Amino acid sequence: MKRSTLILLTTALLVLAALSWWYRPWTPYSPSVMTRLLHPEYRLQNFRQMEKVFPFRVIPASSEPFSFPRGEASLPEQFIHDGRVIDTAEFMLRTQTTGLMVLHQGTNVFEQYYLEATREDRFTSWSVAKSVIGTLTAIALKDGHIASLDDPVKQYVSELDGAAWGEVPIRDLLRMASGIQFSEVYDEKFSDINMLFYRTFLLGEGVRDVIADLPAARPPGEIFHYVSPNTQILGWVLERATGKPIAEYAAEALWQPLGMQDEAIWSLDQGGVELGFCCLNMTLRDYSKLGQLYLQQGVWQDRQLLPEGWVEQASRRPEPWLAAGNGYPERGYGYHLWVPKDPDQEFFFNGVWGQTVWVSEKHNVVVAKTSVDPLFRQHMAEVISFMRAVSEFVAAAGEKNNRG
């Protein structure tokens, strides 16, 4: 065989191998799909159809679906943020809102979809899933699957005995105080969080394998350090404590009793493990039910789903290092939920790209907002101002209507 022919054949084989790796027809994790996930041209569609991006496990709709009674309310035309008047319509467009739903006193008073989204769409949660994991942890505690929040991880996940994770109490996973060394900086190409995505989504490694041997930077329970592996480990504890995959336990403990109207899906790694720190996909109406459960102090249709006092414990932490200003100027943290600066009986679930479920106990309001906002960090304080304005406006309108 001539040298030139051999070189040509070798080159062709290398190109074929590269194309095969890039498109990977034998696996659901295709780099060609992964690299388009966040691309401006595709993300609007991807965030509403993640079943075409990742493998998943189904969470069936409840056999007894619940619909909120309907009412009618408008949004404030303007709101104040940082001393400036913000036009609501402009804000909704600028933050690339795909859905907005407002509940007042358990009534659906506003529901609207944008950017071609519909009520049937399953919107991806990103880190709102963390609050769902926190909620499931509370239910597992109430039902006796978890004995105490002070139990160490190794008591439930024997594989982590001897690892830095093993000695971390469940409580410190919930309040993001594990002490584990990890960088959750999305803007740095090779940060730990981006390498977690690369290794799990592109290289096909199991998510647990990627994070199991992370080292400790400090003892647990000393400072707030928000990192996604805390939630992934918490999900591992949940699976072992309940004896069920996370999605299956969510179906039994949350979806069925809450009367979730629509099927949800939870994205998986290649080994079939739920990506607990992100990637739950559900409809806007069902997102709002999660907020309403917390507004009702964990009670749903006369059934106490969360431990008594859980909502107060989760949203009103006494630790000064969990307050706003410890890593995030406009918000602090609780048990896997966020608390705005200077809270007035309010807290929220939040995910990147602008996913928010807001709960105002003072105004008896829940606001659920889904988005594809690339400037979500820059807009965070403004989103809080918007949520507060909507809560106050809707509550005031309701009181006015009640007075006749």
Question: What role is predicted for each listed range?
Answer:
Residues 143-181, 213, 241-278, 282:
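Active-site helix/loop module of the DD-peptidase/beta-lactamase fold
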Residues 89, 138, 154, 171-174, ...:
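Non-transmembrane alpha-helical segments in soluble domains
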Residues 230-237, 276-299, 355-371:
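Active-site-proximal alpha-helical segments within enzyme catalytic domains
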Residues 96, 124, 160-207:
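Extended ligand-binding groove/face enriched in aromatic
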Residues 261-264, 312-366:
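Active-site Gly/Thr loop motif
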Residues 2-118, 146, 212, 389-404:
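N-terminal leader/targeting segments and the immediately adjacent pre-domain N-terminus
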Residues 119-120, 187, 194-271, 278:
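Catalytic-site signature segments of enzymes, centered on catalytic residues
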Residues 106, 124-149, 173, 234-238, ...:
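Active-site SXXK
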